[in-house]
Amino acid sequence: MLKGTFFCVDAHTCGNPVRLVTSGHPDLKGRTMSEKRQDFLAQYDWIRKALMFEPRGHDMMSGAFLYPPCSDNADAAILFIETSGCLPMCGHGTIGTITAALESGLLTPKMPGQLTIDVPAGQIKVQYQQTGAKVDWVKIFNVPAYLAHKDVVLDIPGLGPLKIDVSYGGNYYAIVDPQANFPGLRHWSAGDILRWSPIVREVAHRELNCVHPDDPTVNGVSHVLWTGDTISEGSNGANAVFYGDKAIDRSPCGTGTSARLAQLYSRGELKVGDEYTHESIIGSQFVGRIEAATKVGAFDAIMPSIKGWARITGHNAITVDDNDPYAFGFQVV
């Protein structure tokens, strides 16, 4: 029996894929996108798996559904999907979704050049520049970001002691700067990152309490951000973000950049008004900026922004037929 056909706009944000699903998204229960996210995970996670996992997706695939706004002041709402689940917030996903939606005529802003978007992590403001039919760039004013844990030494089996910070930028990140047991991003292979990241995340998740003060459904270390030397002109720092089971973000990562800004602000290395050009593992760049200081519960926090670009790569119609033994996807590792 046919389960559904999903029309999609495929794109990438600075090298990382975004699949905007334009039809077939379910009617979700809940007043907020946080509540709708929980309903999607409970009732419709087969859609995510079918569209993100092989054979219709791949290890790096991420995507989004565009929904009507939950708030009176918003233009739209976004539900993020990827191989690891439904993230509360996704920076590269927002940039790609907004670009694809505007260029495809799926989103009409109340005020050209500006958008207000409801996401599971809260509400974000967006600015963009469009020349003719093409969106040149998108700037996200993200949810508040803060440093949750500082200078925590974890014992990583097989690697040894590793000092990390944990910072929130829409998701919780274990941030690893160069040190004795990590010589820096450019001195490790992608295989090294894929090998050690799940172990670091598991230990950090087990030993550190990470629960968002305003939304307890947002909890636990989900990403690992490794830092190192830059390769692109104009970059202030470089990172490789691990997420899911075996994915390394090809973009500089929007929520990761937000988390990095919060970490550097907490350490006194950045101040309000500073920009920070953040580089990905492939050398693509986001421009992060600390817009303002704020609070998240008892934590000192920042209001970060991230500016980047995306390009549409194609359009497709994906059929999910439960007569197919791989209708709901698979993962090899």
Curated annotation (Swiss-Prot):
Pfam families linked to this entry: Pro_racemase
Keywords in alphabetical order: Isomerase
Superkingdom, natural source: Bacteria
Swiss-Prot/TrEMBL catalytic activity: trans-4-hydroxy-L-proline = cis-4-hydroxy-D-proline
Disulfide-bond pairs as recorded: none
Enzyme class, first EC level, given as a word: isomerase
Catalytic residues in the record: 90, 253
Residue numbers binding substrate: 91-92, 223, 249, 254-255
Gene Ontology MF, one: 4-hydroxyproline epimerase activity
Enzyme Commission identifier(s): 5.1.1.8
Functional description taken from the UniProt entry: Catalyzes the epimerization of trans-4-hydroxy-L-proline (t4LHyp) to cis-4-hydroxy-D-proline (c4DHyp). Is likely involved in a degradation pathway that converts t4LHyp to alpha-ketoglutarate. Displays no proline racemase activity.
Family label: Belongs to the proline racemase family.
NCBIfam families from the UniProt entry: PRK13971.1
UniProt name for this protein: 4-hydroxyproline 2-epimerase
Protein species of origin: Shewanella loihica (strain ATCC BAA-1088 / PV-4)
Lineage, broadest ranks: Bacteria, Pseudomonadati, Pseudomonadota, Gammaproteobacteria, Alteromonadales
